[in-house]
Amino acid sequence: MKVRKSLRSLKNKPGAQVVRRHGKVFVINKKDPRFKARQG
């Protein structure tokens, strides 16, 4: 999992979901797990 300043480019990928967990924003992509990231 990468830690990224901005998730805008990742959330536009096909299969991406934006999820909030414990006050942090995550992008999960089951279709292409390379694009899994946390904002920070």
Curated annotation (Swiss-Prot):
SUPFAM superfamilies: Ribosomal protein L36. One of its GO terms (cellular component) is ribonucleoprotein complex. Pfam families: Ribosomal_L36 (PF00444). Keywords: Ribonucleoprotein, Ribosomal protein. GO terms for molecular function: structural constituent of ribosome. It comes from Corynebacterium kroppenstedtii (strain DSM 44385 / JCM 11950 / CIP 105744 / CCUG 35717). GO terms for biological process: translation. HAMAP family: Ribosomal_bL36. This is Large ribosomal subunit protein bL36. Belongs to the bacterial ribosomal protein bL36 family.
